[in-house]
Design a protein with these regions (language model features):
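Residues in the short coil linking paired helices within alpha-helical repeat scaffolds
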Residues: 145, 178-179
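Short coil turns that delineate tetratricopeptide repeat
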Residues: 127, 160-161, 194-195
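Residue at a conserved register position within TPR or TPR-like alpha-solenoid repeats
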Residues: 139-140, 173-174, 209
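Structural register within alpha-helical repeat arrays
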Residues: 135-136, 169-170
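A conserved position within tetratricopeptide repeats
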Residues: 89-92, 123, 157, 190-194
């Protein structure tokens, strides 16, 4: 009876096929488990009743240090400045939140489905106010009111802005005033940030050091 030898390459192929099939099955099982967990969490979140949003999550802007100085502007620019001042002053009393690090599902689980529109509006208020501060800072800087621009930008930083332009302009103004200590403090604050903008801001600050 002749000897029958299985070619080594065939054994390797079968081994590879077994491992590949095993890993594929594991991935599919993991995917199914994750999908089931996601939809289970989603279903639970939709049933959560409205919960009070903790007061400490809200931002409380302070514009008491802003002077809104008189500027020598053309009529159209003067009207724009007047509108900007009104927007800043009226925004201060609006509720402001920044919960972008939480998914919609997590928001519903923590605060209830009914609070989603409330949260969305408060986040919109927050983002708008930060943009108003930046617009104001740029205008002040363009009209030789650097200290006023710094005050506005420092307030944005205090409110935990993650908008790069706030930090870029503030750092430039600090450097122009040779305020190395303030620049170091700003760098330390950015290092403690938990934001996708963090590294980009740090890279910019490093160039000024």
């Amino acid at each position: 009876m002749p000897n029958f030898t299985i070619p080594s390459f065939f054994i390797l192929f079968l081994t590879f096929l077994f491992i590949w099939t095993h890993n594929l099955r594991k991935r599919q099982e993991k995917h199914e488990a994750e999908k089931e967990a996601f939809w289970g969490k989603e279903e639970r979140s939709l049933a959560v009743r409205k919960k009070e949003i903790p007061a400490e999550l809200y931002f409380h802007p302070n514009i008491s240090r802003l002077n809104f100085p008189a500027l020598d502007l053309e009529p159209a620019a003067a009207e724009k400045y007047k509108t900007l001042e009104k927007q800043i002053r009226s925004s201060v009393s609006l509720p402001m939140l920044s919960l972008s690090d939480m998914s919609n599902t997590d928001l519903r689980l923590n605060f209830g489905t009914a609070n989603q529109p409330v949260i969305a509006q408060a986040e919109e208020n927050y983002e708008a106010f930060l943009n108003f501060l930046y617009e104001y800072a740029v205008l002040m800087n363009e009209h030789d009111h650097a200290d006023e621009a710094i005050t506005a930008l420092e307030e944005a930083v205090r409110l935990k802005s993650d908008i790069c332009q706030h930090y870029f302009l503030l750092a430039d103004l600090y450097q122009a005033q040779s305020a190395d200590g303030s620049l170091q403090i700003l760098t330390a604050l950015v290092q403690d940030m938990d934001s996708s903008s963090k590294q980009r801001i740090l890279n910019y600050l490093a160039k000024l050091s």
